[in-house]
Amino acid sequence: MSCKMGNFMNLRVFALLGVLLLAGGSGLSVRHLPSNPWKNEASQNIQMRYLAFQYQVIPVGNELGIVAEAYPVIDKLPDWASWYGEIMLSVYVSDEYGRVLASKDTVLVPRPLNREAGLPLEVSLDLGTNRHQPLSISFGYRLVLTD
């Protein structure tokens, strides 16, 4: 009986070590999201399923300012949707492999869904020593639409 218990404990220790190794080596990745290379002060667009982002990147020292508006993709929204119940917009700065180097989430107050008006987003991100490598910008969002 003690031999079986010892094997079970060894198995649990190895399983725990495996989980810790996987968790320690994993970082946030945005490879699955559309992205654009970082361009200073040029107006750019990223189209996603329900929102289209128009944005501009403004570097200030080691910080990166991003001013954006997220417009609803009208033909993708359900006809009954008339209100943003919850809105969280995210900005990600990633390296050439899609690894996130800096990010910021912004929660907006609920509001009527105006199909022609954009949702405002303005963030500042500290890039530290990463400023001098090829960088990309991506966006994410969480929307809860109501009627």
For the regions a protein language model found, what residue spans apply to each?
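Short amphipathic, basic-aromatic surface patches that mediate peripheral association
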Residues: 69-81
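Short, solvent-exposed, Trp/other aromatic-anchored flexible loops in extracytoplasmic proteins
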Residues: 99-135, 144-147
